[in-house]
Amino acid sequence: MKTPTARTSGLFFTFALLLTACGGGANTGTNTTANTSATTNSSSAIPIGIAFAQTSNVALLGQEGVAGAKIAEKYFNDKGGINGTPIRLVFQDTGGDEAGAINAFQTLINQNRVFGIVGPTLSQQAFSANPIAERAKVPVIGASNTAKGIPQIGDYIARVSAPVSIVAPNSVKAALKINPNIKKVAVFYAQNDAFNKSETEIFQQTVKDQGLDLVTVQKFQTTDTDFQTQATNAINLKPDLVIISGLSADGGNLVRQLRELGYKGIIIGGNGLNTSSVLSVCKALCDGVLIAQAYSPDHPGEINNAFRTIYTNQYKKAPPQFSAQAFSAVQVYVEALKALDQKNKISQLPLPQLRTELNKQLLTGKYETPLGQIAFTPEGEVIQKEFYVAQIKMEQNGTNGKFAFLK
């Protein structure tokens, strides 16, 4: 178990700080700027980095995170920011691969000099980019990283996205409530993605724990579009349940092709399909897909009511999980910075010290977020109590749909 070290952040510099690059084991937390206060101008906004995918096949997920973060920025600034000082979110596109995430983190740390980072979009990216921030002693809060081992990357790594080991089994249990006669299960997963490899292990273990027969495990790539071979192989074994661990584009296409080939049973989608963007991929054939949830738009609570209202007014639909988690990650930084500033004026702290103190503060707090109340273990794992399962319900036009939450 890691010892919590302080996470500190400071106000946006009005002059350039000389920081070394974060790659190749360099430690940007120790350089000649250690005695420079975090700001020389109390009116400067507080920079928080947002590293989400805005391009590539992962953009369908990343854009939902961007939406939630932007809502949080305006919401908390309208409420006074950090004791009167506004926050300023600095966005960097991670793209869909590890190199993109590494570049985004390096830019946020070295050029933008952020106090902390929210991101990256994928767990696969986190395993490559988070060590950069860890060496630089820059706090990171994962908003959509659910694979096993994320908080264990280092002292400065936390997440508000509940681990797949807690969330995923709920959808299998829901499927068994809908059809208690399920016996045979086919599993599909994207073998080139760390999260999906982690998630499928949980799904496969859950299948065994429920006494079900795992008849086949089919592999694919997140970049694939043709699943005829894998789908046909699985359908020939007559499964009662299909479980898919993929992203929204590939996962949605797999759902569509399974239905087109005649599969009639229940389909479970993993966390990568937990976005309304999947509806435009499989359209009418998305109907009935089950997906476990770490967020419900109907969760009671003042801040979720506010978040849901703002999101719905802006996007004309209920907020998805990834937007709520991104909002919550920004909220954690805001509340931790406010608490820290009341102890020691953050504008007077050197940036390395500020990042360290911020890290320490955020790990000790409790937060009433759109996800419900959350907190963190000493090693940065989120503590969350409430989880859900939703079923996709498509309208007759085959274009519009929603996530209907099961009781």
Residue ranges and their predicted role:
Residues 2-4, 13-18, 22-407:
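Extracytosolic ligand-binding ectodomains
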